[in-house]
Amino acid sequence: MLSSMVAAGSVKAALQVAEVLEAIVSCCVGPEGRQVLCTKPTGEVLLSRNGGRLLEALHLEHPIARMIVDCVSSHLKKTGDGAKTFIIFLCHLLRGLHAITDSEKDPLMCENIQTHGRHWKNCSQWKCISQALLTFQTQILDGIMDQYLSRHFLSIFSSAKEKTLCRSSLELLLEAYFCGRVGRNNHKFISQLMCDYFFKCMTCESGIGVFELVDDYFVELNVGVTGLPVSDSRIIAGLVLQKDFSVYCPADGDIRMVIVTETVQPLFSTSGSEFILNSEAQFQTSQFWIMEKTQAIMKHLHSQNVKLLISSVKQPDLVIYYAGVNGISVVECLSSEEVSLIRRIIGLSPFVPPQAFSQCEIPNTALVKFCKPLILRSKRYVHLGLISTCAFIPHSIVLCGPLQGLIEQHEDALHGAFKMLRQLFKDLDLSYITQTNDQNGTSSLFIYKNSGESYQAPDTGNGSIQRPYQDTVVENKDELEKTQTYLKVHSNLVISDVELETYIPYSTPTLTPTDTFQTVETLTCLSLERNRLTDYYEPLLKNNSTAYSTRGNRIEISYENLQVTNITGKGSMLPVSCKLQNMGTSQSYLSSSMPAGCVLPVGGNFEILLHYYLLNYAKKCHQPEETMVSMIIANALLGIPKVLYKSKTGKYSFPHTYIRAVHALQTNQPLVSSQTGLESVTGKYQLLTSVLQCLTKILTIDVVITVKRDPQKVHNQDSEDEL
C-alpha cells in the first residue's frame, strides 16, 4: 500500500517546521540555557545542551525538517559549532521573508520597506529571492565583513605577526564555547582539560596540520571510562590504544617497533598461484617449512632490537608463539584509523616480510620510549610512548563519567572545539577585491572575484582611533533624536527619552590572564591594514581567473597592530575604527582575507555589529533586491542576541544593550562588552553563510511529496518456504 501527500513548497510551511525546532533548541542557548531531556524510540534517555545531538536525536517525518537537520549536521562536521544559532537565525530569516511577502502594510515598516515588499511580492517566485541571497553572500557580505566589522576584531594571538598564542585568551574562548554545550557543573573543568591538552600537544612550530590531525583522529586520541566521576578525567602522555596485548613481553632500553598490514607467517601460495599437495608427507614438509620461516623472521626482528609488533590483521598462533619466545610484544587487529594515526605521528611505513630470508637491516622500524599495559577501571589498554616526527606531541585524553551518555556528550563537545579551532587558525579568503584611488589608500570600491560589478562602499566612520568610554549623559539632542529614529525604524525598539539619556555603561570584569608562564594583558586588534597588496593589478578587471593565477605575485605587507586594553570599571573595549596607512600610490588593488585568530566578545556582538553595518548599507543601496535582502538579514541577526538576553532585566536587557551598542557606533566610541568570553569570527561567518545556503535550498522547493509506506514483513530466513 502506497499513499502520498503533495503540498506546495512555501516559506510558511518551512517556517512552521523551523519554529518547532526553534522551540526545542532556544531553551538551551547561552550560559543561562537549560538541558533538554529526550527519550529515544529505543528507550534511551538523552539529557543534553548540545544542539547537534538534540537535533540528530529527533525522529523527524517532515522532509523539510530532515533537510534542515541535514544542513545543520553538514555545518557541524566542518565547523563544530553553531547548531542552535543555526536554527534560530534560519527561523528569523523565514519570519522576515514571510512578513515581507505576506503583508501589504505593516505599521512598523517604513514606506521604503513597503515599496520593496510589494516589488518582491510581484516577482511571485521564491527562486528570485534565493538568487538575491546568493548574490548577497558572494558580493555584499564579504565586503562589509572586511571593510567594517574588521575594525572591531580582536586577535587570540599575543603577537599577530608571529602568531604567538595567548593562553588566557584561549581559556576565554574555550570557556565560552563549552558553557553552551556542557553542564554548568562541568564546563569549566572540561574547558581547562581542553586547554591543557592543547598546550601539551603543541610545539613552538605547530601549525594548522596539528589541528587537522587531532580533528581527523579524535576518536583514536580519547578513551572513555564509565563508572568514575568526571573530575577523574585526565591527560596521559603517549598514545593509548583501545586494545590489549596479544602477547606482552616487558622490555627495557631501546625499543623498536614495526607495523605490519598482513600476516607475518608465510602462506602456502601467493595470490593468483596454485599450490598442489599430493601426499601427507608433502603437507607435513610444507608445514615444517612455514614454521621454520616464521621462526627465522621473528628471530631476525629480535636481532634488530624490534620488541613491538603492531598489526592491523589477526596474526596466526604460530606468529604469536614465536613472538613470545623472542621477547616481542604483539598488538593486533588495530583499525585502519589507528594504524594511520601511528604512521602519521612517527612517519613509519609498514614492514613487509621478505619472500627470501635475509640478514640485512630492517629499514621500517621506529624507536618507542615505552610500551606497557594500562589498566583503567579493570580494562586493559596498550600504552605507547611514541617519538613524534611531526609537530604533534602524542597525548591521549581519558574522559571519565558515571554514564556512557555523559562521556559521549563530552567527547562531542571536545571534538567540536577542535573543529572550531581548526577553522579559527586558518586564514579565510574573501570573495572580493578592493580598489584604492586616493593617496591615503582609502578603499572606495568593492570589486568581486566572482563578478565584474563594483559597489561604492558606504562611509560610516571618520577614521579616528579608539578612546575610552566616558560615563556621560547624551547632551546632543539631535544625536539623541537620530538614535531614537534609528531604533524605531530599523529595530522595532521604542525607548523613552529618559532611558536613553540617563543610561550609564556598567562595570564588567577585566580580561586578565590566569596562566603562570605568560603575562599578556592586552588583546591585539587586527585592523583593516592586513590586506594583501597585488602588484599585478591591471588584468584583474579584465579576467576574473587572473585574480587566482597571480596569487604567487602578492606581497605580504605587515602593519603595526592597535592594542585593546582593559580599563578598570569600564569593561572590555572594542576598537571603533582605525586609519589606513599611506601606501604611496595613486591606485592599487587589495585582495582581502580574514586573518587567522580573529575573535569578538560573546553576547551578540557579532550580530549587532553586522546588523548595524547592513542597515547602513541598505540605506545607501539603490537596488531593491539587495536592499530588501540586507534588511531581512540585518533584522534576523538580532534574533540571536534577543534569545541570549531574554532572561536579563534592567540595564542588562537586550534593548539597553542594543541602545548602548548603536549609540557607541554612531558616536564613534568603543563598544563595551558585559561578558569576558570570546568567540570565533570565522565560525560566525561560516554559520551565516551555511544558513543562507540552507535558506536558498528551502526557497527552491516547489513541491513537497511525503511518501508513507507500510512496514515490510520480515521473513525468517530459515523458514521451510525458503528452504
Curated annotation (Swiss-Prot):
Compartments where found: Cell projection, Cilium
Protein name: BBSome complex assembly protein BBS10
Pfam families per the UniProt record, alphabetical: Cpn60_TCP1 (PF00118)
Keywords tagged on the record: ATP-binding, Cell projection, Chaperone, Cilium, Nucleotide-binding
Keyword Transferase: no
Its biological purpose: Probable molecular chaperone that assists the folding of proteins upon ATP hydrolysis. Plays a role in the assembly of BBSome, a complex involved in ciliogenesis regulating transports vesicles to the cilia. Involved in adipogenic differentiation.
Record GO biological process: chaperone-mediated protein complex assembly
Main location group: other
Gene Ontology cellular component annotations, sorted alphabetically: cilium
GO molecular function, one term: ATP binding
Superkingdom of this protein's organism: Eukaryota
Glycoprotein in keyword set: no
Record note on quaternary structure: Component of a complex composed at least of MKKS, BBS10, BBS12, TCP1, CCT2, CCT3, CCT4, CCT5 and CCT8.
Family of this protein: Belongs to the TCP-1 chaperonin family.
